[in-house]
Amino acid sequence: MGTISASLVKELREKTGAGMMDCKEALTACDGDIEKAVDFLRQKGLAKAAKRSGRETSEGIVESYIHMGGKIGVMVEVNCESDFVAKTDDFKEFARNVAMQIAATNPAGIAPEDVPADLLERERQVYRAQVLEMGKPENMVDKIVDGKIKKFFKESCLIEQQYVKNPDITIGDYLNETVAKIGESIRIKRFARFALGE
C-alpha cells in the first residue's frame, strides 16, 4: 500500500487514542491493515509503559464505586507522576474502570506477590489433594499444581485478570495501554472492597 489516507489514520486514532504520527507509522508498517496496526500500537505501548514503569508516582486519586444498590463498595488508590494527569478524563476513567473491575471480580491482591501466603498455601494444598485424588503420578503432581496456581493468579490477581469490559486483554494490558495513551507511569497502589454482610 503506497500512501495511507487521512481517514484511515483518523479511524485508527479513534480506536486507540494514539497520536497521529504513531497511527500513520503503524499503518505504514502494517500495509494499511487496521487490525494489525492496533496490535502494532499495543505492542509499542507496552514498550513505552516498560520504560516509564520505574518513574515515581506520587500524585493520583482515590476513586470510589458503589455497586448493586449499595451492597458492594470499592475504594482504589491509583497513582501517577503529575497532578495534571491525575485530573485528566482518561486517568479518571481508568481509575473508575479499575474500581468497577474490583467490585465485579473481588481479587485477592493486585499482583501475585500481594496474595496472602496463607491463602496461597491453602490453595496449593487443595490442588495437590485434587490431583492426587485423580490418581496422577507423583512426579507430575507438582507440575500440575503449579499450572493450577498460575490459573488461580489469573483469576485472583487484579493485574492478571481478564478485563471485564474487554475480555481480550488483562487489567495489566489495560494499564499499559493507558500509560501509553497519557504518557506517564501509572500504579494501582491499593484497594479495599466491602460487601454487605461480609
Curated annotation (Swiss-Prot):
Q: Which Pfam families match?
A: EF_TS
Family annotation (InterPro entries): EF-Ts_dimer_sf (IPR036402), Transl_elong_EFTs/EF1B (IPR001816), Transl_elong_EFTs/EF1B_dimer (IPR014039), Transl_elong_Ts_CS (IPR018101), UBA-like_sf (IPR009060)
Q: Which residues does the annotated region (Involved in Mg(2+) ion dislocation from EF-Tu) include? A: 82-85
Superkingdom, taxonomy of origin: Bacteria
Report the subcellular localization: Cytoplasm
Q: What is its main location?
A: cytoplasm
One annotated GO molecular function: translation elongation factor activity
Listed CDD domains: UBA_EF-Ts (cd14275)
| GO CC annotation | cytoplasm
Sum up the protein's function in the record's words: Associates with the EF-Tu.GDP complex and induces the exchange of GDP to GTP. It remains bound to the aminoacyl-tRNA.EF-Tu.GTP complex up to the GTP hydrolysis stage on the ribosome.
The entry assigns this protein to a family as follows: Belongs to the EF-Ts family.
- The name this protein carries in UniProt is Elongation factor Ts
| Taxonomic source organism | Desulfosudis oleivorans (strain DSM 6200 / JCM 39069 / Hxd3)
Tell me the name of the encoding gene: tsf
